[in-house]
């Protein structure tokens, strides 16, 4: 079953965050991560959901998720992301309606 990650960001350094995107995008492509959403103008439905950016990612399964975040090149890119932004993320399993 697919594993999803929802992340919201407060971006403190836009140039730094752009460097992260430039480094991370080829890794997402190489590892076949599906990016369902990447919105830099999200509309919060409640005050605690305010964010400069939101992202929704899909991984084949939990193993794919764990493997992706353990890639050395992604770990290095994530250091740049973390220096440029504050992230809050949640991992969860895809829900499938019973038939």
Question: Where are the regions that the model predicts?
Answer:
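Short S/T/G/P-rich N-terminal loop/turn motif that feeds into the first structured element of a domain
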Residues: 1-54, 59-70, 93-99
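C-terminal structural segments of small proteins and small subunits
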Residues: 65-68, 72-90
